[in-house]
């Protein structure tokens, strides 16, 4: 749109206030100050217009932006917006002053590139520029980063231009005001761009130009004092330039550039492994640490003469940049390992008091916001636990496969600290402890969740392992003892390390322990069972048939020496009870019945066997002394010559073993071969004793006769009759 022209065609109209002198910017070679006004050929006349000025401002700003890369493009847009508002206002003032719009006046275009507005437009004489010509131009001062001197000159020119505008010097030629105002605006923008360049170079270069930083801080302070209040709407002269905000923006941009360049060659999402992401985060931490140390130790002292919050501003800028980078990495994180590396770095590396390498440089927790938003943190933890559940299940599968490989390879038996040892307990304990400890390093909530995941997986693994082992060909005293030890160790170690948190593990581990112990007993029982058949026979009276049986017991006890003591003692007592029970069962179910001298010999033989059994098990460490009286009591009844004392022996037997039944008494009396009347009296007497014994028997009382089956024979029936 063409600019309104004043006056009729003819000579250029002079300013009505010619004595007022004005000064323009000197000739300069600075790029942002070089701007050639476009000539618009239309009908043989040159018409400066708003469109021409917009194009000129755009090209000049573009050249400046290419000279100073990565500066805020909004800076020039804001300045141009103020400029054209002011230009409109100047035009309106010219119209209201009584200068109607008329035909265009041919005017020789002014060259803004030389920094000097033509004197015909303002009435300024050439000698007024001599003080400026003797010194450096504003552009040169900016280029040389003499920002204070450059600002003082710009401030002087700005004050003069405001005075000229107030005195309506530009009433008849508002474009002259626009040219000078545009030149001022571009130089102010150039200073702002130079401030951004100084900030960027301070962080990216190896050294620190403290003089430039001090100059920057001083010129920002001077600008804030000079431009304290905003002007009327549409007037951009003498308005605050907000260079402090521009400095803060430059700090943020430089921090973002530094953080984004860290680990740029690493592609963490290329695979599910954690090594690439860990390398990237290590590089990121190193960059942040180096830059913040540089800020604190080298850059902050340069600002010490001003009130610039250097450390706080850079700290917030880097914190925000790191948070943004982590959010980007979180979107691409894959698998359990990468998620954990990300969470661990945020919680333990970046949040560590010695992250910056010195206690006095520790990152404060306040007033910085969380590095990761709570919602994002919760999502990462949820994703991590989902992957973790699958991973832990897979780890238990691998442990089972390793044990199966050992069974097939029949590896050498291992004894650790005197006990049979299988790697099972160590593998499981390390698996649980490692993941729980790693999760605890991130948060207490994640630790509790991980512990529950491990407990559930272990509860499912133990029965699977038990079933797989018992179905294999590796079942033996050594493996059974080793796995009993493993279950006991897991119970004690896990429950001791994580008390009250994984009680559900108690049930499957106890069940597996009992199962392995049961199969261990079955092995020795099956091995000894045939040796009981020769007891209470004719050959038994004259031969030492008990020794092979005791040899089996001693051999088995050697295995129990390598089983954890509580279970070893319990198993040994079970073997002791098994021997006494099977011995009595063989006596009460005899293949042959003795009378006379053979019965007495049998009684003596039973006494000797009872003593040998008791001595053997006591020598092995059995604490089941309550079993010693069983065989002796039956032997005394069979060998008692004074029949009235049989009643006393029966009373002792019933009191010692309250689980004895009436059919057991009948079987014993049948072996003794007493008369009918005496048998009836003894049965009548023992009936009351048996009833009282059953009534007073405790649930925890030992069991012996209850497990001995006595078939009804002719002799027993005769005894009953």
UniProtKB/Swiss-Prot annotation:
Sequence positions bearing Phosphoserine: 515
GO biological process, one term: exocytosis
Xref: InterPro entries: EXOC3/Sec6, EXOC3/Sec6_C
Record bears the keyword Phosphoprotein: yes
Region entry Disordered, spans: 1-52, 94-135
Pfam families for the chain: Sec6
GO annotation, cellular component aspect: exocyst
Top-level taxon: Eukaryota
Comp. bias intervals (Polar residues): 22-37
Keywords: Phosphoprotein
PANTHER family recorded: EXOCYST COMPLEX COMPONENT 3-LIKE PROTEIN 4, EXOCYST COMPLEX COMPONENT SEC6-RELATED
Family: Belongs to the SEC6 family.
This protein's name: Exocyst complex component 3-like protein 4
Organism: Mus musculus (Mouse)
């Amino acid at each position: 749109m063409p600019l309104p022209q004043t006056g009729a065609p003819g000579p250029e109209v002079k300013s009505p206030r010619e004595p007022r002198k004005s000064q323009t910017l000197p000739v300069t070679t600075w790029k942002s100050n070089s701007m050639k006004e476009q000539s618009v050929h239309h009908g043989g006349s040159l018409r400066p217009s708003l469109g021409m000025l917009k194009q000129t401002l755009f090209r000049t700003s573009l050249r400046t932006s290419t000279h100073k890369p990565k500066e805020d493009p909004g800076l020039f847009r804001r300045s141009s917006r103020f400029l054209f508002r002011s230009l409109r206002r100047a035009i309106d003032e010219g119209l209201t002053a009584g200068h109607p719009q008329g035909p265009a006046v041919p005017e020789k275009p002014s060259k803004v590139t030389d920094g000097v507005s033509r004197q015909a437009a303002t009435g300024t004489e050439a000698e007024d520029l001599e003080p400026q010509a003797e010194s450096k131009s504003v552009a040169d001062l900016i280029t040389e980063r003499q920002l204070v001197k450059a600002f003082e000159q710009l401030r002087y020119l700005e004050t003069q231009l405001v005075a000229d505008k107030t005195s309506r010097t530009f009433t008849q030629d508002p474009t002259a005001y626009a040219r000078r105002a545009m030149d001022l605006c571009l130089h102010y923008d150039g200073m702002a761009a130079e401030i951004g360049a100084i900030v960027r170079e301070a962080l990216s270069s190896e050294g620190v130009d403290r003089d430039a930083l001090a100059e920057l801080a001083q010129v920002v302070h001077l600008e804030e004092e000079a431009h304290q209040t905003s002007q009327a709407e549409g007037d951009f002269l003498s308005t605050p330039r907000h260079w402090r905000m521009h400095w803060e923006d430059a700090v943020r941009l430089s921090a973002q550039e530094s953080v984004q360049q860290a680990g740029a060659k690493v592609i963490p999402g290329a695979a599910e492994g954690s090594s690439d992401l860990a390398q990237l985060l290590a590089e990121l931490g190193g960059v942040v640490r180096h830059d913040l140390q540089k800020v604190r130790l080298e850059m902050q002292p340069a600002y010490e003469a001003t009130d610039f919050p250097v450390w706080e501003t850079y700290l917030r800028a880097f914190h925000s940049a790191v948070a943004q980078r982590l959010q980007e990495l979180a979107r691409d994180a894959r698998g359990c390992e990468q998620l954990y590396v990300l969470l661990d770095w945020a919680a333990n590396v970046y949040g560590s008091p010695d992250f910056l390498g010195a206690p006095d440089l520790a990152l404060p927790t306040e007033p910085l916001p969380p590095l990761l938003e709570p919602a994002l943190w919760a999502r990462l933890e949820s994703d991590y636990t989902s992957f973790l559940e699958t991973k832990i299940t897979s780890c238990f599968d691998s442990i089972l496969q390793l044990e199966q490989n050992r069974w097939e390879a029949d590896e050498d038996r291992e004894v650790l600290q005197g006990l049979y040892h299988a790697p099972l307990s160590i593998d499981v304990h390390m698996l649980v402890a490692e993941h729980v400890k790693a999760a605890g390093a991130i948060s207490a909530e994640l630790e509790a969740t991980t512990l529950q995941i491990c407990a559930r997986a272990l509860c499912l693994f133990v029965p699977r392992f038990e079933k797989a082992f018992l179905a294999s060909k590796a079942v033996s005293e050594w493996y059974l003892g080793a796995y009993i030890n493993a279950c006991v160790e897991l119970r004690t170690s896990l429950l001791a390390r994580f008390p009250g948190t994984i009680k559900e593990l108690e049930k499957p581990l106890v069940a597996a322990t009992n199962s392995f112990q049961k199969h261990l007993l079955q092995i020795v029982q099956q091995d000894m069972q045939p040796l009981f058949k020769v007891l209470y026979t004719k050959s038994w009276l004259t031969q030492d048939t008990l020794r092979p049986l005791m040899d089996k017991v001693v051999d088995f006890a050697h295995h129990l020496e390598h089983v954890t003591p509580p279970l070893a003692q319990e198993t040994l007592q079970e073997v002791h009870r098994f021997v006494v029970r099977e011995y009595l069962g063989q006596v009460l179910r005899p293949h042959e019945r003795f009378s006379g001298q053979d019965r007495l010999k049998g009684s003596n033989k039973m006494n000797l066997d009872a003593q040998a059994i008791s001595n053997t098990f006591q020598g092995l460490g059995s604490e089941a002394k309550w079993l010693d009286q069983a065989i002796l009591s039956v032997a005394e009844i069979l060998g008692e010559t004074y029949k009235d004392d049989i009643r006393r022996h029966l009373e002792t037997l019933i009191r010692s073993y309250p689980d004895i039944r009436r059919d057991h008494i009948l079987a014993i009396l049948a072996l003794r071969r007493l008369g009918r009347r005496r048998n009836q009296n003894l049965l009548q007497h023992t009936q009351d004793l048996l009833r009282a014994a059953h009534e007073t028997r405790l649930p925890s009382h030992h069991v012996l006769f209850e497990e001995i089956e006595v078939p009804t024979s002719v002799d027993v029936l005769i005894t009953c009759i």
